[in-house]
Swiss-Prot record:
Species of provenance: Clupea pallasii (Pacific herring)
Record PTM Pyrrolidone carboxylic acid, positions in chain: Q1
Originating gene: gnrh1
Protein name: Gonadoliberin-1
Keywords, comma-separated and alphabetical: Amidation, Hormone, Pyrrolidone carboxylic acid, Secreted
InterPro entries: GnRH
Function: Stimulates the secretion of gonadotropins.
A Gene Ontology term for the protein's cellular component: extracellular region
Length: 10
């Protein structure tokens, strides 16, 4: 999945 730049998937 694609995550917005600047946010970490955590």
């Amino acid at each position: 999945q694609h995550w917005s730049h600047g946010l970490s998937p955590g």
